[in-house]
């Protein structure tokens, strides 16, 4: 039987309960799962902190670091091609079968790699939170953060 190998990508700036839910969902279904963590120096959150936060909930999850990602985003053909060339370098020879996300771009990633697209809580009905909202008001959204993430964000202010 074919081994089910999934992955997700994200900035995790900061890591929150919606991310945790997505990873938990994937781990239930996959034999192996990778989390691609993008470095985002412009957001002033170190990639090492993001990895620490994720591994505090999932010590055995496989992490792939994504440094110096292309700055061109979007769902237009050119942007997708640029992002996918970069992402393919990150995942390398890993024979992925499933892509997990809560975002519109999930279909583009899955189609490009010719793998299954798994959409998790896209409408944010289970956890109505986005990292950008947390960045804008940590106190208002702290209930969506684990203690370590909240503490680190408070210390960095």
Predicted regions and their residues:
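Nucleotidyltransferase catalytic core that binds NTPs
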Residues: 1-157
